[in-house]
Design a protein with these regions (language model features):
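Sec-dependent N-terminal signal peptides of Gram-positive bacterial secreted proteins and lipoproteins
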Residues: 2-26
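Extracytoplasmic soluble-region selector
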Residues: 24-141, 146
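Carbohydrate-active catalytic/glycan-binding domains of CAZyme proteins
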Residues: 95, 176, 180-632, 637-679
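Ser/Thr/Gly/Pro-rich low-complexity, disordered linker/stalk segments of secreted
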Residues: 128-186
Length: 679
């Protein structure tokens, strides 16, 4: 999940800030105590964020303890947060403090008293709300070498992406006004330039950073769940480092043909720092997903890493939410009822043919001292938010992080990212930070090492100067429409943008399974996967569906600043809407494209679209075939009413056959909701 070797140190530093209330030695003691039935004492919370004037009582949690002899509470800074003799904290003014509780206790299996000092870090904020500042990712001119995408024979017509039902009917409000273009400004070029080039299928997204992919198949579509690196980009800026600390949401996309992707947007799961679902979680990294029938209906479960030391779970009744917190607490890791002997990082979830589900996890950061550097696997209970049975180690050689688990044929495949250590013996040819795999006859193992399947992506997609762009990776294997595919991430998009920030982008290439069940090495490239089916332009198409785009955004983010201008946190707004990003000095038209649309033998008669814009404004909309300046199918002016709404049906040129479509906008669009042709 992390990108650079130095991130090992960075993650350790991040862990020291997030895993509060105990040191790593404390985690070791707690995990060991659980397994050996020894006494444990800990605080009800390791970190609190309070507003000035608020009060909160810390409680002592104990296990296998016969008697508490004494408790002494102290604060490192009473002017910020005071604490009473009974553990009640009073937040006084903005700042930070550490609350300590010195506990003297006697274990059930002992007559001697032991003493332990527990900690809770407290952050006190002013009792006022900061003003949100909405920002957009800067538009840069990318340097991308176009690649050729192989043509695939069409097979079936893809199904449309599911549409979430609105929860209420909004009361119309007047649309915001826009800043008019300066007529004296002449655009440097006619069309915005795509960060991913004109013909490439990789990366999957051209207008945002999204990483740590996990893919599942559901009802004829593949859904990909990713970490929202764009959130970190907003917090750090083009010249900042990707430290993952601002990421509190996941990004979800889906496709029926592996080329045209519908952007379902971002979903804030962690709420400890921003306005997310689960207030006890600070970060949302490396989400994974599965579904199973519960009470006769399909139910979806998202597992993710909370700051590198805990794993949380959210539930939903559809693959794209809305998501809800069914468990109400962290699932796995320190300060939970499921402490692990390993590092609770980078979960992967697998549901077997019999309906049994398993969670596998692990990493090399925050691992309890003395424990083996191996991933762990544990069977989930039927409710999917608790466990059924004990965890077991998978003895994966040179394991680092990023687990995956699949069933291929009659074998169970465990895959993972290798570490940076020097190899010896039978593993001397195993690349650093590559994806390796093992096989077993049972989900719980034992697993046998097979080999490497995905070399380090930085040896394929290099830096602008031609040197290797070595980084850790994160992957996902999925079977879709009879074939296997490997999802992974690279920093190709940031290289194209010419920025320092190591934003990661998800790719996909085919994974070939040989007759004996082993894998060929995945051939990584920008071509990606050939289109699996013709696209139907006569269905209602979400404006969030595209194979490529430029000068357009889909997700939205609020950057919350302190008074001195320093970023406090970055809140990702749930969902998405396709909108133009106006930069008149650089380009005239923003655009999106659809690959492989079948217009039929007679071609369309009309083009329909629904948009939102600025009140009483207008935008020029064009639809062209096969190129940005290709054959015009539609060229019309869209006029918005005072509410910013527009719904059009205009004549279309009867272009026949299969074509790539380019939908182009000269002007400002707040939300390109949907479109379709009619015969």
């Amino acid at each position: 999940m992390r990108d650079y070797k130095k991130a090992v140190l960075g993650m350790t530093l991040a862990l020291s800030m997030v895993v509060t209330g105990s040191s790593l030695d404390g985690i070791t003691a707690s995990a060991a105590a659980k397994s050996s039935k020894k006494a444990t004492v800990k605080l009800s919370s390791g970190k609190l964020i309070l507003k000035a004037g608020a009060k909160k009582t810390l409680k002592l949690k104990k296990k296998n303890v016969k008697k508490i002899k004494s408790m002494k509470w102290t604060s490192s800074k009473k002017s910020v947060a005071a604490v009473s003799k009974k553990g009640k904290i009073t937040a006084k003014k903005a700042g930070k403090a550490v609350i300590r509780c010195k506990v003297k206790y006697i274990a059930k299996a002992s007559k001697k008293a032991k003493t332990k000092t527990l900690k809770c870090r407290v952050v006190v904020k002013k009792n006022t709300k900061a003003t949100p500042v909405v920002t957009k990712a800067p538009q840069k001119t990318p340097v991308v070498t176009p690649t050729t995408v192989p043509t695939a024979a069409p097979t079936t017509v893809p199904t449309a992406a599911p549409t979430l039902s609105p929860t209420s009917t909004p009361v119309p409000t007047l649309a915001p006004t826009e800043t008019p273009d300066d007529p004296a400004v002449t655009p440097a070029q006619t069309y915005a330039t795509s960060y991913k080039g004109m013909t490439a299928n990789n990366p999957l997204l051209a207008n945002s950073f999204a990483s740590d992919p996990t893919a599942i198949e559901y009802n004829g579509r593949v859904y990909v769940y990713m970490s929202n690196d764009t959130q970190e980009h907003y917090g750090q800026g083009d010249d900042g480092e990707n430290g993952f600390g601002y990421i509190t949401s996941m990004h979800v996309i889906s496709s029926a043909d592996m080329v045209n992707w519908t952007d379902h947007g971002t979903f804030s799961l962690a709420g400890g720092k921003a306005d997310g679902l689960e207030s006890y979680s600070n970060c949302c990294w490396a989400p994974c997903a599965t579904y199973k029938k519960v009470n006769g209906k399909d139910k979806f479960f998202i597992y993710y890493t909370n700051g590198g030391y805990q794993i949380n779970v959210a539930s939903a009744d559809s693959p794209t939410g809305p998501f809800y917190d069914e468990r109400k607490s962290s699932l796995l890791g320190p300060w939970t009822d499921n402490e692990s002997t390993g590092d609770a990082l980078d979960p992967a979830v697998f549901t077997d043919d019999d309906g049994s589900s398993y969670l596998v996890w692990g990493g090399d950061c925050g691992r309890p001292e003395g424990s083996k550097k191996y991933p762990r696997i544990r069977k989930l209970a039927d409710n999917m938010i608790s466990f059924d049975g004990e965890e077991k180690a998978i003895e994966a050689p040179y394991f680092f992080e990023d687990s995956g688990i699949n069933k291929v044929g009659d074998k169970y495949v465990y895959s993972y990212c290798t570490d940076w250590d020097t190899r010896t013996g039978q593993y001397k040819d195993l690349d650093i930070c590559s994806i390796a795999y093992m096989v077993a006859d049972s989900p719980m193992g034992p697993y046998k090492y097979v080999g490497e399947v995905l070399p380090n992506c930085g040896t394929v997609f290099k830096k602008a100067d031609g040197s290797d762009d070595l980084a850790n990776n994160h992957h996902s294997i999925v079977q879709f429409k009879g074939e296997y595919y490997m999802f992974y991430h690279t920093t190709v998009l940031r290289t194209s943008m010419g920025i320092h920030f190591a934003g990661r982008s998800t790719h996909v290439n085919k994974l070939n399974v040989k007759a004996d069940g082993t894998f060929d090495i995945v051939q990584q490239n920008l071509d990606g996967v050939p289109q699996l089916a013709d696209f139907d332009p006569y269905q209602t198409v979400s404006g969030l569906t595209s194979s490529n785009n430029a000068g357009m955004g889909a997700i939205e983010t609020n950057v919350i600043y302190h008074k001195n201008g320093k970023v406090n946190y970055v809140n990702s707004i749930d969902g998405a809407k396709m909108h133009t990003i106006k930069d008149r000095a650089k380009y005239k038209y923003s655009w999106l494209s659809i690959k492989g649309a079948d217009l039929g033998d007679n071609g369309p008669k009309t083009f329909q679209a629904k948009l939102k814009g600025y009140g009483l404004g207008s935008v020029n909309l064009k639809v062209c075939a096969d190129a940005l300046d290709g054959t015009e199918i539609v060229n019309t002016t869209v006029n918005f009413d005072k509410y910013g709404d527009a719904k059009i049906e205009v004549p279309a040129a009867a272009v026949q056959g299969k074509h790539d479509l380019y939908i182009e906008f000269d002007g400002s669009v707040l939300d390109f909701e949907s479109w379709q042709f009619a015969k």
